[in-house]
């Protein structure tokens, strides 16, 4: 199987998000990379499902709460920006203050 660098990055991100989901289900709090992976995966999958940029900007803030992440992570994470592929093309989705 040959993957482009872009496809490799998406695959790695998807795996990181899945690992974060499993850790969260076990009751562990997530670190910064895990939180970013989970939010990013939510946006990419939402775009694939046909949701709008506006919807994803709102729902991206509901993926994690302060109790889901390690202390200090919400303060380190001001924005998450993702280039996602929508049915009508690639768009930049920005989620401001993603962890409430």
Curated annotation (Swiss-Prot):
Assigned keywords, A-Z: Cytoplasm, Hydrolase
Cystine crosslinks: none
Ranges annotated as spanning the membrane: none
Catalytic activity, reaction form: urea + 2 H2O + H(+) = hydrogencarbonate + 2 NH4(+)
Pathway stated in the Swiss-Prot or TrEMBL entry: Nitrogen metabolism; urea degradation; CO(2) and NH(3) from urea (urease route): step 1/1
UniProt KW Cytoplasm keyword: yes
Major enzyme class: hydrolase
Keyword Cytoplasm: yes
Gene Ontology MF terms: nickel cation binding; urease activity
A single cellular component GO annotation: cytoplasm
Main localization (coarse): cytoplasm
InterPro entries referenced in this protein's UniProt entry, alphabetically: Urease_gamma, Urease_gamma/gamma-beta_su, Urease_gamma_sf, Urease_subunit
Subunit structure: Heterotrimer of UreA (gamma), UreB (beta) and UreC (alpha) subunits. Three heterotrimers associate to form the active enzyme.
The protein, known as: Urease subunit gamma
Organism: Rhodococcus jostii (strain RHA1)
Biological classification of the source: Bacteria, Bacillati, Actinomycetota, Actinomycetes, Mycobacteriales
